[in-house]
Amino acid sequence: MNKKSWIIFSIIVVAIVGGMIYISTQNRLDVSDINNEQLNKTIGAESRNGDIADHEFGSKNPKVTIIEYADYQCPGCSTAAPKAKEVTEKYKDSVQLIFRNFPIASSHPNARAAAAVAEAAGLQGKFWEMNNLLYANQDAWKNANAADRDNVFRLYAEQLKLDLNKYKTDIASSRVKHKIDFDMALGRKHGVAATPTFYINGKNTEMDNSGSIEAAVKEALKKAGVEIKN
């Protein structure tokens, strides 16, 4: 390779590396201003999350808050999530469940698309309904190619009677992208390395079965001074 070719090659390499550094920096969302107390409570709508607040289920004035970081394609999530919701429903006067996206694309290639679908449904007031459908029917789309997966998701949107034009626009929107990226940044700050990961009043809690979920919630309720009626 002559000197001129080396110069051209070097310029190309520098440009590529510089571009990679730029992209990496752009993708590193800064949530350093969010402290640990805020991390374990509802985070409202703001520009970084596409003006989409945390999704809440249960008490609006909770004594116990469950933070769920999940990946819709994760088998463990599809088992644990309904149980966490069931326990929240049982103690709904005192317990709140907050869902945050944490799709792991390296092992679950359809997870982020599913997250976008749930967020798009949420923009039409149907987040939890879509959340339920995605988990309950995980086998129908988890290994599908993109076209088949999107057709399945569209059927869910139709089932929920969503405005399909808005749905189609929203799943590809910057708002939804920002929301998912923001949730993941919160998860990384929270120390999430795998899914599902649950925090009960800030404590990382193993959610391996419905009994352990309820036991952890009951313990937190007792610490908060809530009388539990059997």
Region roles according to the model:
Residues 1-35, 154-230:
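C-terminal cap of thioredoxin/glutaredoxin-like
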Residues 30-52:
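Periplasmic c-type cytochrome electron-transfer domains
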Residues 47-49, 79, 179:
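Short secondary-structure boundary/capping elements
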Residues 47-64:
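A short beta-strand-turn-helix
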Residues 51-54, 83-84, 184-186:
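A generic local structural motif
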Residues 53, 137, 167:
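Glycine-rich, flexible loop/turn motifs
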Residues 59, 68, 207:
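Conserved strand-loop elements at the edges of beta-sheets that form or border functional pockets
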Residues 67-73, 78-158, 188-193, 218-230:
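Structural alpha/beta surface segment adjacent to cysteine/selenocysteine redox centers
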